[in-house]
């Protein structure tokens, strides 16, 4: 018998996460590694759990993630977005809880590009009066 799986794609900065939710005991696997090994910061692990906590489904689903691009923060945000979208496929009645927590919105903030004549995106070269 084929097992039921729910899919969601999340994006944040330059990271893209493909998330699968499978009914289980709450294991989280990121790129075939345990999530505690993959993401060393407890605060970012809390970010990943937010959609499951908001819908009170923590421990009901195994979360299998394939994520690429970006750094720890971008990847954690992408996984959070993907988990929230996958939970909508599980049960559409989770939408109000996820929406009020702001978990369905794609965070569109990106790194601002460096401009010519400047040292960074906005930082100007040092100014000398004389």
UniProtKB/Swiss-Prot annotation:
UniProt KW Ribosomal protein keyword: yes
Question: Where are the disulfide bridges?
Answer: none
Drop me one GO molecular function for this one. Answer: structural constituent of ribosome
Record PROSITE patterns: RIBOSOMAL_S9
Alphabetical keyword list: Ribonucleoprotein, Ribosomal protein
Its Gene Ontology cellular component terms are: cytosolic small ribosomal subunit
Biased-composition ranges for Basic residues?
111-130
Looking at the record, which segments are called Disordered?
105-130
Write down the Pfam families for this protein, in alphabetical order.
Ribosomal_S9 (PF00380)
Query: Could you mention a single GO BP entry for this protein?
Result: translation
Q: Which NCBIfam families does its entry note? A: PRK00132.1
Give the family from UniProt.
Belongs to the universal ribosomal protein uS9 family.
Name by which UniProt lists this protein: Small ribosomal subunit protein uS9
Q: What is this organism's lineage?
A: Bacteria, Bacillati, Bacillota, Bacilli, Bacillales
């Amino acid at each position: 018998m084929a097992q039921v799986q729910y899919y969601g794609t999340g994006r944040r900065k330059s990271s893209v996460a493909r998330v699968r939710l499978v009914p289980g005991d709450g294991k989280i696997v990121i790129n075939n590694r345990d999530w505690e090994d993959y993401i060393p910061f407890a605060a970012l692990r809390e970010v990943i759990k937010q959609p499951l906590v908001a819908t009170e489904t923590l421990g009901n689903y195994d979360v299998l993630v394939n994520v690429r691009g970006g750094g720890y923060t971008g990847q954690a945000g992408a996984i959070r977005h993907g988990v929230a979208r996958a939970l909508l496929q599980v049960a559409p009645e989770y939408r109000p809880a996820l929406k009020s927590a702001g978990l369905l919105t794609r965070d569109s903030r990106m790194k601002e590009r460096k401009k010519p004549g400047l040292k960074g995106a906005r930082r100007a070269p040092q100014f000398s009066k004389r």
